């Protein structure tokens, strides 16, 4: 039911920007927004107070075609636009949402003494286009206080993910940490007394597993899309996938919405990427393992028949398919449904508890994935059961 609700929900008019039901005065459209734009005579920075701390939670609308709003954990919310990935729905709600987003963002920047021109170009353009609500600006200002986060925010991919989830780096560390431990334990179980004699192969296998784990967290993570529109000459397929979310189940920001087809497109696009990642990482890891096995057999004739080489191509393609289907769906559900839609709204003010639950969920997902891989590999015949 929770997954189904990510695709189908009844839109409701968005009449409030917070639980205090503040009414925003209508502000004339800005011909060109910048830090020097004057708000005198229209609205003052003190007319609406942002001194109250805004909870850093996903904002938004979970519509799949029409405008609508989801109030997740008290964050700023708003109706989605139309079903064309950021377009309005034709009844004026999309334009109102973007005007409100623009006004919120500009007021917060003015109160913080930050000029629009000093922001990353993609973020500044998104603010001017009204695609960034005030809660995202609040999160941006919070992240800027950390030197590490400020450095990571220089990179577009990390910037989009950190603005959507301030615990993204913690989840990435959890996943890679669990991956290192479980993969090393599996290597030791398989090699036993030869573990330290085969450290080169162990290192290669673990490194490939970490790369795969990184991409499994990075690609399906919910994002705040800062991508500029494609050129008018771009093909229809390119435009379609460009407008798809990074996570099929992610909550849409105020002023944006995704159709059911676009959400399905997110699964397809990420599946293609994970197939390439899984196949490549398995090719490298399997090739290194086989090379070491053959070298050991050439030196030690007594080792003949002890360890069989692994079929490179079939194993790599099988692993790519496994990541594109099983891993893709599991990690999309973990990030978009369990974490963003269920855990964050309940625990957005209790970061430690939220992190602990995310760790438990991701550890369980990793264990489940290991079991599914063994069953799948035996089913298609690339591994034998003894």
UniProtKB/Swiss-Prot annotation:
A Pfam family matched in the record: RETICULATA-like
Location in or out of the cell: Plastid, Chloroplast membrane
Reported consequences of knocking out the gene: Pale interveinal phenotype due to marked reduction in the density of mesophyll cells in interveinal regions of leaves.
Ranges annotated as spanning the membrane: 201-221, 273-293
Domain of life: Eukaryota
The keyword rRNA-binding is assigned to this record: no
Composition bias type Gly residues, residue spans: 65-85
Compositional bias ranges of the Basic and acidic residues kind: 86-99
GO cellular component: chloroplast; chloroplast envelope; chloroplast inner membrane; plastid
Alphabetical list of InterPro entries matching this protein: RETICULATA-related
Annotated organelle transit peptide span: 1-61
Keywords: Chloroplast, Developmental protein, Membrane, Plastid, Transit peptide, Transmembrane, Transmembrane helix
Key word Transmembrane present: yes
UniProt-recorded name of the protein: Protein RETICULATA-RELATED 4, chloroplastic
Organism, scientific name: Arabidopsis thaliana
